[in-house]
Amino acid sequence: MNPNALEQPQVAPGDDGAGGNNYGTQENSAKEPSKTGSDDSSARLEERPPPLPPRPNTLSLLDEGFISPRSTRQSSSSSLQAKATTAVSIPDISLLQLNDGGKENHPTRGPFGSLRAKASLTQLTASKGSDAGDSASIRSTAPNTELGEAENVFSDFLAQESGDVQQDSSGLLQFPEFRTDDVEDDFTSEFEPIGELDDDGRNEELLLERWKSKRKHYLILSAAGKPIWTRHGDGGLISGYIGVILTIISFYEDANDRLTSFCAGDTKFVIVTKGPLYLVAISRLLESDTQLKLQLEALYMQILSTLTLPSLTHLFSVRPSTDLKRPLQGSETLLSTLADSFTKGSPSTFLSALECLKIRKSHRQAINNALLKTKVSSLLYGLVVAGGRLVSVVRPKKHSLHPGDLQLLFNMIFEAEGIKAGGGESWIPVCLPGFNSSGYLYMYVSFLDLRENSGTSASETTTEQSVAIILISPNKEGFFEMQEMRNSLVEQLEKNNSINIIKEAIDGGRPTTTDIVPGTVLHHFLYKSRANVQFTMSSYEPEFTSISRRRSIHAKHAHVKVHHCISQSASSFAWVTPIFELYCVASPNANRNALAQSASKVVQWVQREEERLFIIGGAVF
């Protein structure tokens, strides 16, 4: 038998077999006279690959009945997105792809073009909203999700072959494409001071080792090279590192470019330039550029809340080498507590939204009416806040408080011990950059002692139990007017029993996932209403009591519409629509269909309880 007959045809896609080095031509037929014409024709047919099925223009993740778990396996390097984005979601879903080395490459696009996620697991539709006016809001409903539909949520994500998944001795699934997470790491030492430098400098090496052992650093520097604030250590101790960072930044600026981020090993550096200031974040906590940039923006807003933008600009225009430490004296604690909240995992920063205390709509309306009834002429904003959760707000028509401004206020009020001590009254000048970065407002703060009958002193009251009345006025001399309004408001709240309602809501705590969905596989969830810029979440108990565990579940990396991944400690599911964002965490062995069904039920529960969970409109004057 001729050995050439065993060779396979090499036909390129779309080749008609008529040119080049084709086998089965007349020349080859002459060499093999034993083959008939029909055999030759059959061989040519075998040489052609079968036609591919038509490629769809779009691929819906949620189309019923379409299941192709490995359809997104292949991706060319040309499909990688090179353009950065700060959007919460992007039109084209970014899917996790694996390269030849088994490492993650993301974001990439699937082979079928744009992937479109519907607004719900079962075609979420928006129903009629509330009454027109300032109370208007987006309403939505999520019908029941059947098992088959829940399956389809994950149908186009990578699925490991059953033989690729191994189980360790603890029963956890081992997925080689996911790195071991750091949820068991000890975070207690992260917030401990590194110590003071001795007069003779003998302990400098020890302090530098402690400084380098921290997982996260924040630096605020002037363009002239002066250190203004550092989260760990001081400018003198780490002056060498500061000099290196400034040199790198200056190198790019000299080339008419602006450096925004770079990596060195597993450490990420993000730089935000604000006029004469450089704000630098250094992180080994697997955070994205966007996350770190938002954190630096919040620290900058904290500086503006103390100085205002015109004052900051004037200081550096008169003297570019100004040392900003003295004007910011007293704000170091606020900067540090704000920075630590980012490291611990702040849901408010993570979602750029506020959390509200869950109470009945009628009870919240009673508090709103009390605020309106006792309002004085110089009032700009009035808030009742319980443990950092908003209970009620009164505001001018067509004016809303920026979530970033409220985050600064809550950080100042609930973290600064001087304000909270004794449960007394405070009158504080403050700039709200989101409202007006050019001037000061004046904030009256009074803490209510709800624990007087339980024998707990005001100084022992935890942040979660603290209730504050915050009244903001543009009038510098408005203290006594605000004090009078506070007294009248407390009298009204006691008369309509709102004080006890707030106390009961605080004592009740956040609901657990099993309170909401009995028998659910979920351990924790975060739900953000994008229309109201507010969020709600389940209790941390009992799975997420430590700082490291909480930080791990509040670490968002990808900008996608539907995302499911599994690590050695947890299974997570993210679902982003124009109406809401939902982030869920379950055990690593959780069934993905059960996870999707539980997520849908959480959405239904939130929408049933919407007016209890969120402040829609608030009190308006």
From Swiss-Prot:
Cystine bridges? none
* Stored InterPro entries: FUZ/MON1/HPS1_longin_1, FUZ/MON1/HPS1_longin_2, FUZ/MON1/HPS1_longin_3, Mon1
Q: Where is the composition biased (Low complexity)?
A: 68-79, 126-137
Q: Where is the composition biased (Basic and acidic residues)?
A: 29-49
This molecule's function is given as: In complex with CCZ1, is required for multiple vacuole delivery pathways including the cytoplasm to vacuole transport (Cvt), autophagy, pexophagy and endocytosis. The MON1-CCZ1 complex acts at the fusion of vesicles with the vacuole, through its regulation of the SNARE complex during the coordinated priming and docking stages of fusion, and particularly at the stage of tethering/docking.
Task: Provide the protein name.
Answer: Vacuolar fusion protein mon1
UniProt keywords (A-Z) are: Autophagy, Endosome, Membrane, Protein transport, Transport, Vacuole
Q: What's the source species for this entry?
A: Aspergillus fumigatus (strain ATCC MYA-4609 / CBS 101355 / FGSC A1100 / Af293)
